[in-house]
């Protein structure tokens, strides 16, 4: 008999780690305080009537250029090694997987975060996630940021609950139709 799948979805910032992920390595590399950086993000959000997530992504790029801090996929992933977790997080995944096995279910872990995907990919817990849905940048052939590739704001997070539930995990030109199509409960993957 096929094991039922139980999906556990996590936010990242202030849920698995103790503060916003940018505050461990990125903001210090700019020589700024967290309050100054987020203050600028909020001021831009208000002045431009802008999505707060796009505003922080813009400010990350703007401030990195201004302070001559190189940011690439690789540097973001290295910043992931600086993330600090709440007590028990590092052992949680293996413990809950073992419990799932004991009770006859397969446990899958997913991230649905407004944080930076590349930083999460560089964390020591990234290997436990089947899929990481988070804000992401597009890079040129030199590895430099070109544009926001994906922004996961607070209301957009719900689409990932449906993606996981229906088993439409890939984001591509064909997935929107599959995602929006009615799927009877008994045909859903999770």
Q: Locations of the language-model features?
A:
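Conserved acidic, metal-coordinating active-site core of Asp-based
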Residues: 130, 134-190
